[in-house]
Regions:
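Catalytic Walker B motif of ABC-type/P-loop ATPase nucleotide-binding domains
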Residues: 77-80
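Conserved ABC ATPase signature
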Residues: 52-56
Length: 189
């Protein structure tokens, strides 16, 4: 499990941090060393083993916490808002890491309120509102359902035909409806 806000032991080196968590799962020293080396390689932190955790950037700490979460080879990796607080470059690096984990057959459950961040990662999603699953399925089907249920509503003071002409030129507009001076536009992207 990787929470949205994660704590790290700042006074530990990266290798000590991994040793600590490996020992929590009753792994032997040999197992911890082997698995830690593989995981730190996976998250691109091999060169940081002897660096104190508090000197790592937020993105590096995030990747370290993924390595920590994987140390016992879980069948499910749960991530809560994994891109929270990351700069754009770190977000991209983290997304590449998650794609790599998915290719290695990890099952990953991600909690996020930013659907666009999930587009390249997920095979299916569920939308929860007020603690209730309101939609679930393939991302493209969910996006179509959301798009079709939430048109952009425009009130035009004059020149409705001109407004319609402009909207029809947009390749993202999938459907339009007109009621006097009110236009509803649905988008496909």
């Amino acid at each position: 499990y990787l929470p949205d806000f994660f704590g790290v032991y700042d006074n530990l080196k990266v290798s000590e941090y991994m040793d600590f968590y490996g020992s929590m799962y009753r792994m032997t020293s040999r197992e911890i060393t082997a698995v830690s080396n593989d995981l730190l390689e996976l998250v691109n932190l091999s060169d940081k083993k002897e660096v104190y955790v508090d000197t790592l950037s937020r993105g590096m700490k995030q990747r370290l916490c993924v390595a920590r979460a994987l140390i016992h080879n879980p069948s499910l990796l749960v991530l809560d808002e994994p891109n929270s607080g990351l700069d754009p470059r770190s977000r991209k690096d983290f997304q590449l890491l998650l794609q790599r984990l998915a290719r290695e057959d990890y099952t990953i459950l991600i909690s996020s309120h930013i659907l666009s961040e999930l587009a390249d990662l997920c095979t299916s999603i569920g939308v929860i509102n007020g603690g209730v699953m309101v939609q679930q399925g393939k991302l493209e089907n969910i996006m179509l359902a959301i798009d079709s249920s939430n048109p952009l509503r425009i009130t035009v003071l004059n020149q409705v035909p001109k407004a319609l002409e402009l909207l029809r030129q947009d390749p993202q507009v999938s459907r339009l409806s007109v009621d006097e001076n009110k236009i509803a536009a649905w988008f496909s992207g």
